[in-house]
Amino acid sequence: MHLATSIAALGIVGCSCLRFAAGQGSSTFRFVFTEEPGQYVVGLRVVEQYDHSRTFQLEGGSSEKSAGVGSPRPLQTLVWYPAPRSNNRTMTFGNYEALIKTETSFGKPVEDGKPQKFVESYMEGTTDLPAWAVRDAEMHPGRFPVVIYAPSLNAPATENIELCEYLASQGFVVIASPSMGATSRSMTVDIPGANAEAQDISFLLGFAVSLPDTDMSKVAAIGYSWGGMAALFAAARDKRIDALVSLDGSFRYSPDTPHQAADIHPDRMTIPLLVFSRAEETLETWDAMRQDKNQCACAPNVLNEWTQGDLLHVRLLAISHIQFSSLYQRSERFKKDGLHFVPADYSLEDGIASYNWMARYTLEFLNAYLKHDDTAVLFLKRTPAENGVPKHLIALSLRQASHQPEQANTPAKK
């Protein structure tokens, strides 16, 4: 689980359009999530469960020797949910960090494995900061829409804590598990890897049915990077998913992967899709990626094919791929090295603002298409400037499904 490996594997950094600054970042920079919480307190429950339909090879400690072959697939499941107000103490980011130690070992902490070292390196200096969630809080009465979050390549379920807590505070049950390969902790950038995470999404939806606070008639999937590919696969196969959100999903950069899967047909999908993309690459960068057989093959573009469902494309002009994750932006490492990734003429602070707007647009999209909220619909139809977004941060396009009337003032139901 190495960030540089993830970047290289997915072609997610275009060298020619990024600023490789001589400086070492800003000593005053601090990532702050500024969106206001909703009406609910956030609860968090951690469920250790297995998918007995699939086998998994466990790894043990620093030796990385197999501790068990043919074991059922472990899925450490994080559930953020609306909770009633209380005087209970909220978690810290250090409490979240500790979860990685039993991510696949369940009750047998691993201190120095690759996932543990990865999370520790990005949590360093932030462990005392307060989060929003209250561990094991009571569930708020009622039933709420379900959102499954699919992390990026090899990433933990805690990759976007702020986004998940924010949505839970606004009345959603958000569920996540780690990004893992088909038979082991290491994810692979291929169809078996995407299939594995897509199956995890469907497994989590099956688990969500058992929760007393979920409304399974309103379901969305969110995927970041390689998780975006997996979420696309899941949405194409699992008809319980009513809406899809892609945080710079890999299907834009590896269109041949869904094409090779044979049963993924974006041109037939009728659910709404919200796509966030980073600062665009230059033509030279795209040409270089085309020379990589894993990137930009001659296959139909998913967004161009997405004509039967509404498509909202939000271009975040000020950020690079890794800035879609609060785990990265919040870290001391990013504070030191972030300017190496930021697009030219933008600042680290622009990246903070962009992340916050990403969360806001995600919320409004889910409110519009899952809760059918008229105010959210109007928000999505306005220009970014009309919504208060600084003009240099976002470019937006909204294309309604081909079978819908142009004048429709409410999102189409699935």
Annotate each predicted stretch with a short phrase:
Residues 126-185, 253-254, 283-285:
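Short substrate-entry loop that stabilizes the transition state in hydrolases
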Residues 159, 189-216, 233:
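Alpha/beta-hydrolase active-site loop
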Residues 27-34, 43, 84, 318-322, ...:
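Alpha/beta-hydrolase-fold serine-hydrolase catalytic core, especially in secreted/extracellular enzymes
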Residues 221-223, 247:
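Short beta-strand immediately N-terminal to the catalytic nucleophile in serine-hydrolase-like folds
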Residues 223-227, 231:
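Gly/Ala-rich beta-loop-alpha elbow adjacent to hydrolase catalytic centers
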Residues 138-141, 242-321:
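The feature captures the conserved acid-bearing segment of alpha/beta-hydrolase catalytic domains
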Residues 83-122, 158-185, 191, 313, ...:
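Active-site machinery of serine-nucleophile hydrolases
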Residues 24-147, 348:
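Domain-level recognition of soluble alpha/beta enzyme cores
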